[in-house]
Amino acid sequence: MNWYLWANIITAVGALGGFIYGGVLFFRPRKAVYAQMITFAVGCMAFGRIYQVIRMLTIHDISSQFHLGFLGVIGSLLFLFSANYGAMDGLVDDKSKELRKYRIIPLAAPVLFLAIYLIFFLFSDQPLRVKIMAGVITVNVMHASYFNLKHLIFPDVEYGVINCLKGYNLLALIFELLCVAEMLTMNRDFQVLTFVIGILMGVILPMMVIAVNRGGKKWSA
């Protein structure tokens, strides 16, 4: 059994389902840009993994060099970051001194991911190519995870929307953790663990879209 192939197939199917579901729900007049960006994030994973499945079926390799499937993860993380930073953070954080601790505590997430990268990649005997690719993913995970954790713990002092999206932000944090875990397991050829991560990604990605939809309905009710 090719564990890597099936991991990518499961992730691709789940992400594609979430992307189609989000496309039907959110790409209509007067729908929130925030929800559309989350849908695009899931779509990036879907098409990135579809590419990897095709690559594995044709040349039986996804890791020997940089390839387009790698951009699926990067695109997904960039959309997650942009959604929270660009479309939501200004509504949540008024930059008051009283809420400073809620800006400091979320630094724990990027610090954790940076430590993982330093220990297992940068200060290891990994090839330069691996260090660079892992570094690019880590930087994007750091940016996205900071705002997901911030919006998970931040008190909703004015608009009420952030409380409705806590479920989504938790799922997004788990997804970002899975991105780093997958990077580690593939690098060390832990095929069964990579397969398990693929299953989890295939479940969590569509759940992110569902959580955003439920949060939006709860807020507007």
Regions found by a protein language model. Give the residues of each.
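Non-cytosolic membrane-interface motifs at loop->transmembrane helix junctions
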Residues: 61-72, 126-137, 188-198
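Internal transmembrane alpha-helix with an interfacial aromatic "cap," most often the third helix
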Residues: 18-28, 53-105, 114-121, 148-151, ...
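Hydrophobic transmembrane alpha-helical segments in integral membrane proteins
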Residues: 1-20, 69-70, 127-138
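Membrane-helix boundary elements
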Residues: 108-132
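A mid-sequence, solvent-exposed acidic-amphipathic segment
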Residues: 48, 123-154
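Membrane-interfacial loop-to-transmembrane alpha-helix junctions, especially the N-terminal start
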Residues: 29-44, 95-107, 156-169, 219-221
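C-terminal transmembrane-bundle signature of multipass membrane proteins
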Residues: 80-83, 141-221
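Hydrophobic alpha-helical transmembrane segments of multi-pass membrane proteins
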Residues: 10-22, 34-58, 70-81, 111-116, ...
